[in-house]
């Protein structure tokens, strides 16, 4: 038996126009549609990344605001306690 027997049984990768190509005839997506979907997914990923970054920045700002409000409330509570006689300065 010769080593080259069966060498050309599979279609070549650049033979996408052939309707007898088993992969494309079975309904698999074409190279162009895969590229379009990949570009779409990359755009979506970029949009989501930007949105998460903005949300993170807003959350950091709110956390700092919350901390400053907490500190102000503790100071006010201490002031009220001193003025009402519950604690000493």
From Swiss-Prot:
Compositionally biased tracts (Polar residues): 9-22
Keywords, ordered alphabetically: Glycoprotein, Host-virus interaction, Late protein, Membrane, Viral attachment to host cell, Virion, Virus entry into host cell
Record: glycosylation sites: 18
Location of region: Disordered: 1-29
Major place of residence: virion
GO biological process annotation, one example: symbiont entry into host cell
Transmembrane segments: none
Gene Ontology cellular-component terms listed: membrane; viral envelope; virion membrane
Stretches of the chain forming a coiled coil according to its record: none
Entry's localization field: Virion membrane
Keyword Phosphoprotein tagged: no
Domain of life: Viruses
Protein name, as recorded: 10 kDa fusion protein
Source species of the chain: Orf virus (strain NZ2)
